[in-house]
Amino acid sequence: MRELGRRLAKLLRAGDLVMLSGELGAGKTTLTRGLGEGLGVRGAVTSPTFVIARVHPSLGDGPPLVHVDAYRLSGGLDEMEDLDLDVSLSDSVIVVEWGEGKVEELTEDRLRLRIDRAVGDTADEVRHVTVTGLGERWATADVSVLAG
């Protein structure tokens, strides 16, 4: 998952919203950790579950990474508006774990990644990732670099 995050970083730019979904332990934060490495941001990317959101400034001239865990939010745009994500969106890459039904109103352009673990004891590390690009931004984007 970490390597997938590094590859994903090559596609992203300021203004991008990435929504991650999958069961607990699927690898959402691990993917985001790789994304942070690929974007070259400062600080270790860890789960923002208890603080809801963390901002990781760029070490270079790239966009900062805003990492949000919406798991504990009850839903609706009101709670998300309190995080001022609409203000951060234009100059940051925003990654939201558990954001379905909560952040879609921020922008029509978003990239959704659904992470599923393979079933069975021997397949613990196998993940299946479904990538869906929505909106004009992703209509012509080549997401084939994510395969591997």
From Swiss-Prot:
Gene Ontology molecular functions: ATP binding; metal ion binding
UniProt main location, coarse: cytoplasm
Keyword Repeat: no
Disulfide bonds: none
InterPro entries linked to this entry: P-loop_NTPase, T6A_TsaE
One GO-annotated biological process of the protein: tRNA threonylcarbamoyladenosine modification
Location of the protein in the cell: Cytoplasm
Coiled-coil boundaries: none
Binding, Mg(2+): 29, 97
Keywords: ATP-binding, Cytoplasm, Magnesium, Metal-binding, Nucleotide-binding, tRNA processing
SUPFAM superfamilies: P-loop containing nucleoside triphosphate hydrolases
Membrane-spanning residues: none
Binding site for ATP: 25-30, 125
Source superkingdom: Bacteria
One cellular component term from this protein's GO annotations in UniProt: cytoplasm
Main function: Required for the formation of a threonylcarbamoyl group on adenosine at position 37 (t(6)A37) in tRNAs that read codons beginning with adenine. Is involved in the transfer of the threonylcarbamoyl moiety of threonylcarbamoyl-AMP (TC-AMP) to the N6 group of A37, together with TsaD and TsaB. TsaE seems to play an indirect role in the t(6)A biosynthesis pathway, possibly in regulating the core enzymatic function of TsaD.
Entry's family note: Belongs to the TsaE family.
Record's protein name: tRNA threonylcarbamoyladenosine biosynthesis protein TsaE
Organism, scientific name: Streptomyces coelicolor (strain ATCC BAA-471 / A3(2) / M145)
